[in-house]
Amino acid sequence: ANKRPVWIMAHMVNAVAQIDEFVNLGANSIETD
């Protein structure tokens, strides 16, 4: 079966400290503003 990737995006990450927070919540991609 062809499996497509699933992206769990952290939206509006505006500080470096937020990266760890969102990754710990399960995000596997980061979108910055």
Curated annotation (Swiss-Prot):
Top-level lineage group: Eukaryota
Post-translational events: Contains 2 disulfide bonds.
Protein's UniProt name: Dermonecrotic toxin LbSicTox-alphaIB1b
Enzyme Commission number(s) of this protein: 4.6.1.-
Task of the protein: Dermonecrotic toxins cleave the phosphodiester linkage between the phosphate and headgroup of certain phospholipids (sphingolipid and lysolipid substrates), forming an alcohol (often choline) and a cyclic phosphate. This toxin acts on sphingomyelin (SM) with high activity (9.5 U/mg). It may also act on ceramide phosphoethanolamine (CPE), lysophosphatidylcholine (LPC) and lysophosphatidylethanolamine (LPE), but not on lysophosphatidylserine (LPS), and lysophosphatidylglycerol (LPG). It acts by transphosphatidylation, releasing exclusively cyclic phosphate products as second products.
GO CC annotation, single: extracellular region
Reactions this protein catalyses: an N-(acyl)-sphingosylphosphocholine = an N-(acyl)-sphingosyl-1,3-cyclic phosphate + choline; an N-(acyl)-sphingosylphosphoethanolamine = an N-(acyl)-sphingosyl-1,3-cyclic phosphate + ethanolamine; a 1-acyl-sn-glycero-3-phosphocholine = a 1-acyl-sn-glycero-2,3-cyclic phosphate + choline; a 1-acyl-sn-glycero-3-phosphoethanolamine = a 1-acyl-sn-glycero-2,3-cyclic phosphate + ethanolamine
Organism: Loxosceles boneti (North American fiddleback spider)
GO BP: killing of cells of another organism; lipid catabolic process
Binding site for Mg(2+): E31, D33
Highest classification ranks of the organism: Eukaryota, Metazoa, Ecdysozoa, Arthropoda, Chelicerata
Active site positions, chain numbering: H11
Keyword set includes Cell division: no
Protein location: Secreted
